Amino acid sequence: MTRFVFITGGVVSSLGKGIASAALAALLQARGYRVRLRKLDPYLNVDPGTMSPYQHGEVFVTDDGAETDLDLGHYERFTGVHATRADNATTGQIYSDVIARERRGDYLGATVQVIPHITDAIKEAVVAGTEDLDFVLVEIGGTVGDIESLPFLEAIRQLRNDLGAGQTMFVHLTLLPWIPSAGELKTKPTQHSVKELQNVGIQAQMLLCRSDRPIPDTERRKIANFCNVRPEAVIAALDVDTIYACPVSYHAEGMDTEVLRHFGLPHDQEPDLSAWNRVLDAMRHPEGEVRIAVVGKYTALLDAYKSLIEALQHGGIANRVRVKLDWVEAEIFEKSETAIEALRDAHAILVPGGFGERGSEGKIQAVRFAREHNIPFLGICFGMQMAVIECARNLAGLPDASSTEFGPTEEPLVGLMTEWARGNELLRRREGGEMGGTMRLGAYAAKLAEGSRVAEIYGKTEIRERHRHRYEVNVHYREVLEKAGLQFSGMSPDDILPEVVEYPNHPWFVAVQYHPELLSKPFDPHPLFSGFVGAAVKKMRLV
């Protein structure tokens, strides 16, 4: 029997529903249960693929090519269970599906309404493909009281009736603010949030209360009394030094025990949290610190690089060092000739993905600085494209090398595959048309050159990595670039698409077209990030 746990949030946004959901899933998984997490997003966009990074943060890409909410990254990192496009539904997707059904005549002339048609579609999205699971945890985006969330709340209310109380549970995440002048935690916001939830017909069975300090028993009983839950079901979600402490912290508060008790399942045996304890030990007892400069273009909102930040921390865990990130806006290198010297103290330099011309010349300067000063370098997606252009301009005698993303160029080192392989049977994009759905998305196979650094890093020559890009490195320039010293050490199986480049004579210089950060886990760091941070450690010890 599949059990559904619905996680809602109240009082304020950004309380950490995604982390809480992932932590609970990890605890249930540590007890041997099969779990899956899903996210319902109340925005009207079909997916976040065309949303600004400043608006939405990172777009997390799944193996099957879905562009999803960044919370799905947390789900994967905490559980190791790969998400699919079925695990993220938006209002835009739901409405598009219902309207398409109406146009086909599926509703047989009925008046199409939010109830039952939209809510039925939401319920279908929640339960689809969950037959072989023990638990499905469903996070409802937004905050209770938002008008956008109402159809989703109504749908999960109906699901409790459809499935029965024995198969469903509602967990509500709230805030307990500390008021210094009063010297106490205030419970009134939580009470009002629960009342708001009750107004739409939902009674929470557990309250997860965010707080920067323990909840006194008197306040716990008060919350339980006013909010109609058991005192044991008032769980303190205390602030912790790292998100990876949440499973251990929530278990200490009895969260997983209370969930199992609600469903009438055995809860006497302790979960196996040994992997989480090893992660925490490595993070809390580092043997050094490395400084990595990240030269980006969305540094005003670090959520745009969420998976990257986590993957670098995973590399630190693998090497038992603390990773300190120095965020550098690429454009500063274009405005000042001396600004590039800020990279001199870095133990490693990373140029991440991005879109558009802004900051591209600054990134190219950062690539050159890393190459010329023997600083470990990792380029990702757009970062690889800039590394290739830098090589073409400064080593291969092609000063006009550029990307067609920035405009017409005589030397299109980077371009849409349609521009330099027109007619190829492997083309997956449309010229022109809508921006959504025009990228290379999802997991693709690649082959690595025998004896290359990247093959040594992976320990194998066949890999599968996730992509999200519209432009490709032009394979027609491979020969001239390799003569200049840049090895094409990873290619698509058909030898059409360059996947990895490296400088064999550099201490550690690797650039990849894909996004390795999307597959990294705290207890299973991605080899590229383990190797990159390891190279930074060697550089640190030489300084």
Swiss-Prot record:
GO biological-process terms attached to the record: 'de novo' CTP biosynthetic process; pyrimidine nucleobase biosynthetic process
Residues noted as binding ATP in the record, renumbered to the chain: 14-19, 71
Domain Glutamine amidotransferase type-1 positions: 291-542
GO molecular function, one term: metal ion binding
Sequence positions that bind UTP: 13, 186-191, 222
Keyword Transmembrane: no
First-tier enzyme category under EC: ligase
Residue ranges of the region described as Amidoligase domain: 1-265
Catalytic activity of the protein: UTP + L-glutamine + ATP + H2O = CTP + L-glutamate + ADP + phosphate + 2 H(+); L-glutamine + H2O = L-glutamate + NH4(+); UTP + NH4(+) + ATP = CTP + ADP + phosphate + 2 H(+)
Residue sites binding L-glutamine per the record: 54, 354, 382-385, 405, 470
Pathway given in the UniProt record: Pyrimidine metabolism; CTP biosynthesis via de novo pathway; CTP from UDP: step 2/2
Residues that bind CTP: 13, 146-148, 186-191, 222
Keywords: ATP-binding, Glutamine amidotransferase, Ligase, Magnesium, Metal-binding, Nucleotide-binding, Pyrimidine biosynthesis
CDD domains: CTPS_N, GATase1_CTP_Synthase
EC number assigned by the record: 6.3.4.2
Regulation: Allosterically activated by GTP, when glutamine is the substrate; GTP has no effect on the reaction when ammonia is the substrate. The allosteric effector GTP functions by stabilizing the protein conformation that binds the tetrahedral intermediate(s) formed during glutamine hydrolysis. Inhibited by the product CTP, via allosteric rather than competitive inhibition.
GO annotation, cellular component aspect: cytosol
Metal-binding in keyword set: yes
Catalytic residues (UniProt): 381, 515, 517
List of residues binding Mg(2+): 71, 139
Subunit structure: Homotetramer.
Physiological role: Catalyzes the ATP-dependent amination of UTP to CTP with either L-glutamine or ammonia as the source of nitrogen. Regulates intracellular CTP levels through interactions with the four ribonucleotide triphosphates.
Additional observations: CTPSs have evolved a hybrid strategy for distinguishing between UTP and CTP. The overlapping regions of the product feedback inhibitory and substrate sites recognize a common feature in both compounds, the triphosphate moiety. To differentiate isosteric substrate and product pyrimidine rings, an additional pocket far from the expected kinase/ligase catalytic site, specifically recognizes the cytosine and ribose portions of the product inhibitor.
Similarity section: Belongs to the CTP synthase family.
Protein name: CTP synthase
Name of the gene encoding the protein in the UniProt record: pyrG
